[in-house]
A protein has these predicted regions:
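Conserved core of the sugar-phosphate nucleotidyltransferase
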Residues: 102-188
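Residue-level signal for inorganic ion chemistry
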Residues: 29, 98, 175
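Short beta-strand segments
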Residues: 7, 94-96, 124-125
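N-terminal glycine-rich phosphate-binding loop and ensuing alpha1 helix
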Residues: 1-48
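Short glycine-enriched, charge-decorated loop/helix-capping segments at active-site entrances
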Residues: 19-23, 66-68, 188
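Short phosphate-binding loop-to-helix
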Residues: 46, 52-95, 101-112
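Short, high-confidence coil segments that cap the C-terminus of an alpha-helix
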Residues: 42, 88-89, 116-120
Length: 190
């Protein structure tokens, strides 16, 4: 089974409550969920929330919501909590809640990557990285090596060696076991 999980943490640091911020008359995460639900290759889509306020703002939209701990260090940890209860999941797609313009084709393409049994995890990047993007700390930059492996993610690249630099798209994908291995890794000090 292929599962999409949208982690939606209310207490975001840079823009608190952004997931329920009004975007054309509805909470931003609603647009994200509507996009993810259009993916052809997902069997199930779950919204992973962490507050009653989020639940109250979204309950009338009919999404499959799971209340998660407020104590997670990352959205991926929130996804792991949800997926732990779905052991029949083979491929897990983690789309960040603040991606209302996510291209559903990217989701389906990432699911297709897992036809190769050697693939355990991945993400999406774009070559479209402008000078403004480079200077914007709100844009996550993915630094990749010559084999197209991501070696780091950065918001601020001022202290970085410029090499294979791409714009990161807020989506990750994992096999079930890889998700839990990843969520058990020590956190970066950054």
């Amino acid at each position: 089974m292929n599962i999409g999980v949208v982690p939606a943490r209310l207490a975001s640091k840079r823009l608190p409550k952004k997931i329920i911020a009004d975007l054309d008359g509805k909470p931003m995460v609603v647009d994200t969920m509507e996009q993810v639900l259009k993916a052809q290759k997902l069997d199930k889509v779950i919204l992973a929330i962490d507050s009653e306020e989020t639940f109250d703002a979204l309950k009338d939209y009919g999404f499959d919501m799971v209340m998660t701990s407020k104590d997670h260090c990352s959205g991926t940890d929130r996804v792991a909590e949800v997926v732990k209860k779905n052991e029949d999941a083979e491929v897990i797609i983690n789309v960040q809640g603040d991606e209302p313009l996510i291209d559903v084709n990217i989701i389906d393409d990432l699911v297709d990557l897992f036809e190769d049994k050697d693939v355990n995890m991945g993400t999406a990047i774009s070559k479209k990285l402008t000078v403004d993007d480079l200077l914007d700390d709100n844009v996550v930059k993915a630094i990749i090596d010559q084999d197209k492996n991501v070696i780091d993610f950065k918001r601020n690249i001022y202290d970085s060696e410029i090499g294979g630099l791409y714009r990161h798209i807020g989506i990750y994908c994992f096999r079930w076991n890889a998700l839990f291995q990843f969520s058990m890794l020590d956190r970066s000090p950054r």
